[in-house]
Curated annotation (Swiss-Prot):
Pfam families for the chain: TsaD
GO BP annotations listed: tRNA threonylcarbamoyladenosine modification
Gene it is expressed from: Osgepl1
Cofactor annotation: a divalent metal cation
SUPFAM superfamilies: Actin-like ATPase domain (SSF53067)
Protein's name according to its UniProt entry: tRNA N6-adenosine threonylcarbamoyltransferase, mitochondrial
EC annotation from Swiss-Prot or TrEMBL: 2.3.1.234
Keywords: Acetylation, Acyltransferase, Metal-binding, Mitochondrion, Transferase, Transit peptide, tRNA processing
Biological role: Required for the formation of a threonylcarbamoyl group on adenosine at position 37 (t(6)A37) in mitochondrial tRNAs that read codons beginning with adenine. Probably involved in the transfer of the threonylcarbamoyl moiety of threonylcarbamoyl-AMP (TC-AMP) to the N6 group of A37. Involved in mitochondrial genome maintenance.
Residues holding substrate: L169, I170, S171, G172, G173, D202, G222, E226, S329, N330, T357
Binding site for a divalent metal cation: H147, H151, D358
Subunit and interaction comment: Monomer.
Length: 414
């Protein structure tokens, strides 16, 4: 049985009354229900409210997603209490839409899977509280999901990928390099020592005031940087990738942010404009910081591949590198990683962009994987808790650093 620490976030016991009676009012169209196992996945770890039903063969029977992006763009970042309230306002509708699209009721489900770690505490609490009430009302098994494990395994829904494989998870909240040896068997090779790449790109976008740019006003920060960088010259400014002399697989993005912030301040003074106005060189700055980010990610990933092959953790041939998370949708960064994959005889695989960002499908699929393997399927949820902070797998990053693998220089012809 999966036991979680009692020091993690406490969830009040669901009320005995069947508060989700609305679920019994679904108009279920007559049809032949699949004999396959069905898992409802619920995702509320950050600022997206997602739900989906997936069967054991990987068919997505229904899904729904509510994004809070436009709300948080106006506030300059995610405000946890606001995210919590928006989850509360939308989770019932999202789950109802998902089940209606499948033409099933909760009684038809084999289990309910929900993200409980890691993430924003207030957001995680909404999803877990809602899920536990469904679990108790309909007497279904509960499958607690690790958000980053779900991202890592999403590729097995869309592609035939066998264990082991290497995964780079890059988003606004995480930057992790891990070897995936099984459904719940991960070796952590490296992680960000400070902030995540998506967070850094968002902060640079805010510093450049890209929300005021006509091409970028409705985009997230990272997407705005990618869009603007297409018109920029990355050679116009020199921004070097961080940690170039550290022979490990860890990452750092705070330095990139500070260097870029100083550059922006300098250019504002040079152009005689106030903070908050658009620089004429904004596209060049975006291109330079994006290139430095891509090179940093590529070099650490290159070292991870070499380490895994040296230690016989990956096959010398036919090795697979999976890149997932919101930043994985950046095509420039993906191209840099493709160069590394080609140089190391690896196959680079990325989930479709809509599955790279947070969604209910990946949670439901992770539930299916766990249900099939008999891992972490709970029938007693009395002690279940959410965990805002939670590591991924077994950390062997020190062993990677001790190997001190020198990475050959690659020409990043991007």
């Amino acid at each position: 049985m999966l036991m979680l620490r009692r020091t993690a976030g406490a969830i009040p016991k669901p009320p005995k009354s069947k508060v989700y009676g609305f679920l019994r009012r679904f108009s279920v169209h007559p049809r032949t229900l699949s004999c396959h196992k069905l898992v409802l996945g619920i995702e509320t770890s950050c600022d997206d409210t997602g739900a989906a039903v997936v069967d054991e063969t990987g068919n997505v029977l229904g899904e729904a997603l509510h994004s809070q992006t436009q709300v948080h763009l106006k506030t300059g970042g995610i405000v946890p209490p606001v995210a919590q309230q928006l989850h509360r306002e939308n989770i019932q509708r999202i789950v109802e839409e998902t089940l209606s699209a499948c033409r099933i009721t909760p009684s038809d489900l084999s289990a309910i899977a929900t993200t409980i770690k890691p993430g924003l505490a207030l957001s995680l609490g909404v999803g877990l509280s809602f899920s536990l009430q469904l679990v108790n009302q309909f007497k279904k098994p509960f499958i607690p999901i690790h958000h980053m494990e779900a991202h890592a395994l999403t590729i097995r829904l869309t592609n035939k990928v066998e264990f082991p494989f290497l995964v780079l998870l890059i988003s606004g909240g995480h930057c992790l390099l891990a070897l995936v040896q099984g459904v719940s068997d991960f070796l952590l090779l490296g992680k960000s020592l400070d902030i995540a790449p998506g967070d850094m790109l968002d902060k640079v976008a805010r510093r450049l005031s890209l929300i005021k740019h006509p091409e970028c006003s409705t985009m997230s920060g990272g997407k705005a940087i990618e869009q603007l960088a297409k018109d920029g010259n990355r050679f116009h400014f020199t921004i070097n990738p961080p940690m170039q002399n550290a022979k490990n697989c860890d990452f750092s993005f705070t330095g990139l942010q500070h260097i870029t912030d100083k550059l922006i301040t300098h250019k504002e003074k040079e152009e005689g404009i106030e903070k908050g106005q658009i620089l004429s060189s904004a596209a060049d700055i975006a291109a330079a910081v994006q290139h430095a980010t891509a090179c940093h990610l590529a070099k650490r990933t290159h070292r991870a591949i070499l380490f895994c092959k040296q230690k016989n953790l990956l096959s010398p041939a036919n090795a697979v590198l999976v890149v997932s998370g919101g930043v994985a949708s950046n095509l420039y960064i993906r191209k840099a990683l493709e160069i590394v994959a080609n140089a190391t005889q690896c196959t680079l695989l990325c989930p479709p962009p809509r599955l790279c960002t947070d969604n209910g499908i990946m949670i439901a699929w992770n539930g299916i994987e766990r249900l099939r393997a008999g891992l972490g399927v709970l029938h007693d949820v009395e002690d279940i808790r959410y965990e805002p902070k939670c590591p991924l797998g077994v950390d062997i990053s020190r062993e990677v650093a001790e190997a001190a693998i020198k990475v050959p220089r690659l020409k990043m012809a991007l």
